[in-house]
Every structure is written in C-alpha cells, then in structure tokens.
Amino acid sequence: MDAGSKKEDFLLLEDEKFDFDLSLSSSSTNEDDEVFFGPVGHKERCIAASLDLNRRVPGQPLAPGSGSPCTLSPLTGEKFVEVYKEAHLLALQIESHSRREVAQAATPQNPVNQGKETFVQDSQLKVSLFEKEQKRDRSPMSLKRETFCLPSSRVQPPMGEPQLLASPGLLSSPVSAGPAQTQSNQGLPCSSQPLPRESSTSQPPSQAGPQKRITSKLQPPRALPVRGRNLHLATEKLKKEVPASIQRTKLVNEKGSQSDVLQDKPSTAPDAASREGHPGKRSLPIPGKLGLKKTLLKPPGYTGNLTRKSSTSGSASSLESGVYRSSVAGKAKSSEQRSSIPASGSQRRTSTSKSGRIGPAASRQALPAAPARVFGRQANKADAAQTVAEQPKVPTLSPLTQQPQTPEQRGPRLDPDTETPQLNKTVSIKRRDSYLSCKTEAVSTTTNPFKVPQFSVGESPGGVTPKFSRTHRLQSWTPASRVVSSTPVRRSSGTTPQGLPGSMRTPLSTRRMSVLPTPASRRLSSLPLMAPQSMPRALVSPLCVPARRLSSEPRRRSTVRAELTQESSGSGSGGQAQGLSSDESSSPPSSVPQALNFSPEKSASPPPQGSSTGAAQGEAEPPEDTLPSEVHGGGCSHTPSEGLLLDLKLDQLTITPEAGGRDLADCPLIDFSNTPESNTALGPSSWPLIDLIMNTPDMGRNDVGKPAKAELGQLIDLGSPLIQLSPEADKENVDSPLLKF
C-alpha cells in the first residue's frame, strides 16, 4: 500500500506542480536565471529526473521500518525537492513567458497602431491643407489673368487709355498730350539738370507717352507692365543721380525728333483706325509675351530702349497703315542712332535683337508668302546688317530690297548658321566685307566658315542666281578640293568650277565647308576621318591614296589639297562631261562591301568604273606595298619630298603572317574545331590561345600529347585539371594537380 501510496504521491507530485508554485515562487524567481536557460533543457531534465525516481522506487520498500520521512529525507527527499523545484520553475517560466508574450503582443502593438493611425490622419490633413493652399494660389492667378485681359473689352483708344493710365499720377499728363507736348517734355530735362529727381520723374512719362500711343495699336494689354517699368526706372534714377540723367537727356534729345517724324508720317486717322481694328485681328498673348520679355531683358538704368521701342513700333504701325518707306527710313535712323550710342556691346546686341523681334512681327503681314519663322530670322539678320552697313556708307538699299525676296526664292531652306546667336554681332561685319568684295569676285576667300553661304544673300544686283543653286555650287566645289576625305570612287566625280583657278580656294575655307548641310553621300564620305574603319578602307585599292594619307598624318592636308586641286583642274573636263554634282554623285553600292574587305590579297582587283578617269587613275596600278607618294607622283611631281616624309607603308598597316602558317585574320582566339592532326600540320603561329578539344581529359595524357602541348605554349590548358577526384588517375596526378583525394 505504501508503494501504491508512493506511486500515488508520484502521480500527485506531477499534479501538484501548480500547488507548489505559490509557496516556492520567491525562491524560484531568484533561481530562474542561474539554473535554467531554455524550455528544451527543462523538459529533458524533468524527464531524466522522473526516470531516476522511477528506478529507485523499488529500492525504497527495503527499509519500510525506517519510515517514510527517513526514506524521503536523505536521498529521495532531495530528489523530490529538486523535482519540485524543477517543476515549479518550469511552470513559472512557461507562465511568465506566456504572460510576457501576451503583454508584449498587446501593449506595443496598440501604441504603434495608434501612432500609425494618427500619422495617417495628420498626413491626410496636410495633403488637404496643401490642396487648399494650391486652390487659394490658383484663384488669384486666374483673377489676375482676367483683369489682364479686361482692357481688350474697352479698346476705344481716345477714351480707354486715359482710364487705364489714370491710376498712377505720373502718367496722366503726358498721355493726354500729343507729340507736341512730348517735345516740350523732352526739352524739360535740359533745364532741370541740377534737379535730377524731378527730371527722373518727368522723363519716363515723356518716353512712355508716345510708346503708349503706338503700342496700343499692337498690344492693348501692355498697360500694367509698362506702369511697373516706369516706377522701376524712377527708383533706379534716384540711385544713379546726376551723370546718368545727363546721358539720358542726350539720348532723349537725339531721339525726340526721330520719334516725332515716325509719328507724324502716318496721320492720326489711320492711328485711330489701327487702334480700333488691330486688337480684334491680333491675338492677345503674343503682345503680352513681347511686353514681358522687354521688361525682363531691359538692362538697368538704360532708358534708351524705350525710345528705341517707340521708334521701331512706330515704324511697324506705319507698315500696317501702308507707308513702307517710312519704316525703312525709321529703321535706318534707329540703326544710325544705335551705332552712335556710347554703350557696351551687350546692350547694343539686346537692342538690335529687340528691334528684330518687333520688325518681323509687323512685316510678317506684308509678306505672307514667306514662312513666318524663316522671315523672322531673316529680318533679325537684316537689322543686324543695317547697324554696321551704314557706317562705311556701303549701299544698304540693296539688302533691304533683296532680303524680303530671298525667302521666296530659296523657300524654307536656311543655313544652320542663321540660328547661331553670334550672328547678331559677327554677321553684320562679315556682311559689310561681302558688300565690298562681291563687286570684284564671285566668291571671296575667307577664314571663317560662316561667311561663305551668306554672300549670295546680300550680293549687289550683279549676282542674279538665287541662293539655292549657289549653295549647291559651293557644295559641289568641295569634292574636288576635299578629295582627301572621300572614297576613291568620288575622287574626280565632283564638278570643278569652270572659271576658278585653284588659288581662289584657300585650304581653310574649303576644309571648313562641312559646316554647310551636306548630302548623305558626302556625309558618309567624311566619316572615315575619325572612324576606325579608315584603316581597312585604305586596303581597298591603290587609288585610295588620300584616305591613307589622312590616316597617316593630318598635318599634310594643306599640301595634299594643293596637289589634288591641280589634278582635279586637269581632270575637270572628264568630271564635267558626266555632270555629276555632290548631291548626285553618291558612291555606288559596290564600294560599301569593299570598305569591309580585310584580306589584302583579294584587293588587287581594279575598282568599279563608276567615276571618270582622272590623272591619277590613268596610271598603271602599282602593287600593294608601294608608297602612297609613288601613286600620287604622276599627278603632281613638284612635291615628292613632302609626300615621302610622313607616309605609311601597307606592311605597317597589316601584320604579315609567316610563310608556313595561315593568315592571322583567320586565326581565332578560341578554336573549338581544331584537331591535333590539323594543328600539327599547321605551324605554331596559327595555334589558338585556348584549345578546348585537343586537351580534353578524354584524350589520354600520354607522351604524345605533352610534347605537342609544350610546342604550342598555350596560355590555358583545360585538359589537366588542378584538382582531380578520380582515384584511378593517382599515378598521373603526381605532376599536375595540387590536391589529391
């Protein structure tokens, strides 16, 4: 029964784990960290203790008389206590871990979720606030645009403008007055020079008055930016004081008569008619853009722009009213005044560009046949040409009368030079030189590439041919003078000019003719200057001497060009008989695969006879290894020493293989199809660097393979591995592998 009771006690001990938790909780909490580490260790220890107890249970009834406490106290009692402690610790740890997990799962997730929720709410609020701010920003912009377009509804010119300009106190008096009062106002600053502030307040309205009257014809909604501009000028004049005001009075006195002349030529009746009728025809955003550009691009403290704008806009209005000569005279006067102003080049450039912007805007209606963009560039060029053209008194009426006609002659074809910003300053000087030189020569030689296509535009009545054909003639000169960069087929195909000796084409002008728009054939022919395909193209035929020379040295271009021009002049009759220009004489399709022919033995065949025979082509074809100067020596024998200095032989261009081996062009780096028989038959020069078939492990590494491998001297031998795992090959692994298994 005791044993049964003990067994029941054992069973009760397993059930009493939860009962001892309350009593031993303090001690178990102290020994938590010392005794136990993980739940797996607890289970294993508990199982071991239970097994030990079960083994010792039958030994306990041997001493039943001693009593159960005696038997429990020495050994079994300690074990029971240990079992109890372990059970308590297990229960405590399991409960504590479960509670901690529950607490950690409950507590940290709630604040994180709360923070995320609050953050999302805040972000949504911020986004809504930004949207509200954007809506607030958009609404006044739309209101401003509506107010900006409002003056178009009240366009009655005599009544509308005083209403627009009555708000600033500065502009009320001069606008109501006519041009007679503007003269008196312009005369005022001379008397008020010791008072610069009064002159600064009275001077901008006097300048803005005529400008207001004239720009209202073109752009009625210009009231607000001009108003802000006058205030800006007044503040800057307060800063600059006396010397700036004196200089401005001189400018105003010089240009007062000019603006009055431009305003008095068209009568007041066409002014009113153009005021009333023009804003209906013209769209509003274009004048607004012009006004904004002028306010932004105005240099600080430079008030001459106002009178210039008034004069140019006055000439534009006179164009619309039908008086065309007055606009020419106004532009001429404005250009003269512009050239005499003591200002920097940048200010003069901005003034010419501004006048060029207003000029085509008005004259575009007079010439609707020409495209708008082309004529804008052309008129901008014309104003730039007038500024310098009137200083040496070269006749300026010829470009003024011819340039509106040149867009009709040549259509939308414009050189890319007109788009460069340098032409506002440089083209006018070159144009003046072209006026002086077009009387003597048909085409004068210059060092600047921009000047060549512009002569035909402004030539005096001697040049009758339109620019379209003349630019083609300029392009057709280049294959005769730039034969150096062309293929041998096109060497003598371009027609040389009939009455021009070779001295008139200097190397610089003809070399830089590539700035012009070139046809596709010449574009392809000029590529081998920098492309790596020029070396195989040199191997096509012995007639490709100039391309070889370009690859040898660029310093010899001038001498070769001088020689080739004489040859082309000698062979010009054959080229002219065919009548091939640079656009028509494209290289035949047979020359394209020849450029990629790498074998020098097959290139000794004669080239296709697509071009006329010149002086150099009439010679016998020399072998491939001859010098290029020998090929060229028949055409020009006066400079053989210069040709011999920097020439490259063909054997330097190609690496000559050995006599017994194959050509190196056919020798691959990695050859997958070589057999040892073919490799031994061929010389060692044609062995591949890596051979994947001869040195495979399948081929036995016997005495036959190793001397062949020594003869080859290959870089990588994939047949002998560094690590070999087969135990059968241990005898052979003594030499090659690093590790054995």
UniProtKB/Swiss-Prot annotation:
The modification Phosphothreonine is found at T465, T518, T696. Residues 310-321, 360-372, 478-497, 578-593 have a biased composition (Low complexity). InterPro entries: DDA3/GTSE-1 (IPR026657), GTSE1_N (IPR032768). The keyword Phosphoprotein applies. Residues 101-120, 131-428, 450-512, 550-640 are annotated as: Disordered. It is found in: Cytoplasm, Cytoskeleton. Induction: By p53 when exposed to different DNA damaging agents, including gamma irradiation and chemotherapeutic drugs. The keyword Flavoprotein does not apply. GO terms for cellular component: cytoplasmic microtubule. Phosphorylated in mitosis. Residues 131-147 have a biased composition (Basic and acidic residues). The modification Phosphoserine is found at residues 73, 139, 153, 191, 245, 311, 460, 476, 493, 509, 514, 521, 541, 582, 599, 720, 726, 736. Residues 106-120, 173-209, 246-261, 337-355, 398-408 have a biased composition (Polar residues). Keywords: Cytoplasm, Cytoskeleton, Microtubule, Phosphoprotein. May be involved in p53-induced cell cycle arrest in G2/M phase by interfering with microtubule rearrangements that are required to enter mitosis. Overexpression delays G2/M phase progression. PANTHER family: DIFFERENTIAL DISPLAY AND ACTIVATED BY P53 DDA3 /G2 S PHASE EXPRESSED 1, G2 AND S PHASE-EXPRESSED PROTEIN 1. This is G2 and S phase-expressed protein 1. The lineage of its organism: Eukaryota, Metazoa, Chordata, Craniata, Vertebrata.
